[in-house]
Amino acid sequence: PRFNYDIKFFRSDPMGEINLDFPYLIPFKPGENAKVFDVKTIEGFWGSEEPDSWNATGFQTAPGEPVFASRTGTVVEIVGNTRTGKPENWYHTWTNSVTVLQPDGTLICYRNVIDKNKELEVNEKIFAGEQIGVVPPNTNELILLVFQNSLNSADLRFIIPRFVVNEDKTELLISSKVYSVVHPEKIRGLEMSRREKRRNLK
């Protein structure tokens, strides 16, 4: 007998079990304030097309402001102000971005971040609360997208993360509200091994 089959490649893990209550860190320096805005469009994220349904978190910021990882993961793509390489290898079509594969199989894209000092590398593990870059010149917003490939559809699944707003509380962020940035060690260490905690939590 002959069997027909298709080979599919997924950037994220379509079978990953997502904990919608997982606590994400607000991606700025602890002690600072972060103001949230309503993201109206993700134009340019997926080529000339915009997904029919999507969710994104936007923060007002300023050029040169440090940006920190909201969650532990592995860097899969670092893009400056222009894209190179084969489009079929891209995770999306945004520039000035860092994309990270998270432990639950989802991807997080930090849009409007540059690795000015070239300290990040693809396949490098980064930890929640670790600086990953700065906001580029002439930019006053940072956008976060958490997404996952769908197993039986070309559509992406977008996740609305819950962010840590104080030592013991997480919530969905509200547009136009100002939040104090906190990075509790117990949250930063959630996806670290004991050895990683000793090296990174001081």
Label each residue range with its predicted role.
Residues P1-W94, P184-K202:
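Surface-exposed, glycine-biased beta-strand/turn segments
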Residues Y24, E119-F127, P137, E141-K202:
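Acidic, glycine-rich catalytic/binding loops that coordinate metals and/or anionic ligands
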Residues P63-P66, V98, K116, V122:
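Short, conserved secondary-structure segments in the cores of folded domains
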Residues V67, V75, I126-G133:
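Generic structural signal for buried aliphatic residues
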Residues G80, Q131, P136-P137:
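Short, surface-exposed secondary-structure boundary micro-motifs
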Residues R83-T84, D115-K116, N140:
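A short acidic/small-residue loop/turn micro-motif
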Residues H92-T106:
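OB-fold (S1/OB) nucleic-acid-binding surfaces
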Residues D104-G129:
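Short histidine-centered loop motifs in beta-beta connectors
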